[in-house]
Design a protein with these regions (language model features):
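PLP-dependent amino-acid enzyme catalytic core
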Residues: 1-136
């Protein structure tokens, strides 16, 4: 899948390029050129790591399925105490999605724990070897 800049729709890049670059040269965000259809009923049968891999693979088409499966398993496994994407029953058919089971007890863990793995793989996909410093 290609991603284009919000400031120049003619500027298209792969998912690896978008992740490695962050922002477009014009200062825009990279957005997917389309939004794939997914089988929601099939997704409901998966645990959170498998569901994440299934959705992400539709967008990050230059990443291998094996890498995405392993990355989501490692990311949403032990660090989330087995409760990644946990739906807590409230009452009857009402549930609350608990987003605080990550290592820092914040919703941001869902993205920020996976992103470094995606960045390292993006650099491999692009043949880039320079060091990257991530400030947290």
């Amino acid at each position: 899948m290609q991603f284009f800049s919000t400031r120049d729709q003619n500027r298209k890049v792969t998912s690896s390029e978008a992740i490695a670059q962050g922002l477009s040269n014009e200062g825009g965000l990279f957005v997917p050129e389309s939004f794939p259809q997914v089988d929601v009923k099939a997704l409901c049968q998966l645990d959170y790591p498998a569901m994440a891999a299934a959705v992400i693979k539709e967008y990050l088409t230059d990443y291998s399925q094996e890498f995405l499966t392993e990355a989501t398993r490692k990311t949403y496994g032990e660090a989330f105490g087995g409760k990644a994407g946990y739906l807590a029953p409230v009452e009857g058919d009402t549930y609350a999605l608990e987003l605080w089971h990550g290592p820092t007890c914040a919703f941001k863990d869902y993205a920020l724990q996976l992103m470094p793995k995606l960045l390292v793989e993006a650099k491999k996909n692009l043949g880039r070897t320079e060091k990257t410093l991530i400030l947290v």
